[in-house]
Amino acid sequence: RQLATNTPAINWSEFNFTFSPNSRQILATNSVKKINYLLSLDTPVTSQILTDVTDNLKTIYLDWQTQTETILATKLQSLPKAIQTLIATDSAQNIQFSSDDHKVLYLAKTDADLEANLITPPPARSTQTEHRHLQADHYYVYDLKDDTNFLIGSKNEILYPSWIPNTNNLTFVNQDNLKVIDYDGTNRQIIFAANFNHRLVVPWSSDKIIILTTPYPGASENLYSISIK
């Protein structure tokens, strides 16, 4: 489903898009024309009054940076200290919590062995094979309730990973395909194989993902939502 249509004055394929920390807004930037629009994804873009926010860019970026740093700092404190020291925190992309904050996707910054029983695990937990020997530059998911740790893949094959809201699944880009994977590293599937902008993939809900793509070869790029099951 197309989220924004072109108009005589606006061709969205000429814009770059940046999502806010909570993924509820998009900053659309046309660097050639030096125009910036802040779009809300809570209402259809076509019904919004577009206002150039170029004069407020510094404030917007500082606010988003503060939001990101505050959120990450707070959530990092919920992790066992043994994991905190192993996570690469130079980018928000490297550490992401699931919607319920019970699981964390993280990029290991060094080889290490993750000791067992960092927390007291419940009587019943996942029986999938764990990976507690960490390799640098590999993504893992740690379950804060079960004390389980699963390998997702190396950062060279897991590009732009993100949690799907209200699920235990992640999306990522691999070999020009948009894929989904369970938090325990199982059940990889391709959900979109056509041309799309790899840097703009945003899981919007448990059954919907926003991407920047073209409906057919030669058409202008635009924002679309795709349904997933």
What are these regions (language model features)?
Residues 1-229:
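Sequence signature of WD/YWTD-type beta-propeller architectures
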